[in-house]
């Protein structure tokens, strides 16, 4: 429930200056009121007519104007004055109440224009308080129903919040699983790539090793073939030289006899030395 806002009530200047005086009725009406017969007061009715000069005990102060021989109707002006005063006071009260009501209504209308929400809340609170006074059981039932509806709404909100939290947790778990699976797949791919590279390097090394082995296997055969060829060449050269030495000294003019020079003997020595190397090949380290 919202707090009640008490609004100040200011009286108009006409009311704040003093009590309002009722408008005096016209002279004709006053005369008519005087002419109309009024009922005698109780004191005047009970006054004995046999003793006109005596005043009853206890009423000397009120009826001091009574004189011997005067009629009982002299009490009427005093009664009329009292009635007029009472009527004037009642009219003043009514007029004041009306003015206050009007001023209050004006103030409420102004407040409604200035503060419509507060005024509505005040009206609702007033209506509820009145309803509680008039229909307490119904108000209690309404309050219980409102409380139950509020509790239901709170329960529903809590359930919705729980469901949302569960959904968020499930989504987060799913995302984490996906990330973990992606990381695992990436790791597997990297391992496969590394294994493939290792296999390729291993195969390449094996091929290179095979080529080296083949080359090493071929080298001794080449080495043995080369000395044999050299030996054949040396033998051919020796045969040619021997044939040249056995030829006659006299040859046709066209053929010139070529004597072996000193520089040609050295190759023969070198050939013999090479033959020895072929027969005794050096040891492989």
From Swiss-Prot:
Q: Where is this region: Disordered?
A: 1-93, 120-256, 266-285
Which ranges does the record mark as transmembrane?
Answer: none
Q: Where is the composition biased (Polar residues)?
A: 27-39
Q: In which tissues is it expressed?
A: Keratinocytes of epidermis and other stratified squamous epithelia.
Note the coiled coil stretches, chain numbering.
none
Q: Which InterPro entries match?
A: Involucrin_CS, Involucrin_N
GO biological process assignments:
keratinization
Q: Where is the composition biased (Low complexity)?
A: 72-87, 120-129, 137-147, 235-248
Q: Which domain of life is it from?
A: Eukaryota
Task: Give a Gene Ontology cellular component term annotated to this protein.
Answer: cytoplasm
Q: Where is the composition biased (Basic and acidic residues)?
A: 149-165, 175-185, 200-233, 272-285
**Which key words tag this protein in UniProt?**
Cytoplasm, Keratinization, Repeat
Job of this protein: Part of the insoluble cornified cell envelope (CE) of stratified squamous epithelia.
Q: What is this protein called?
A: Involucrin
Taxonomic classification? Eukaryota, Metazoa, Chordata, Craniata, Vertebrata
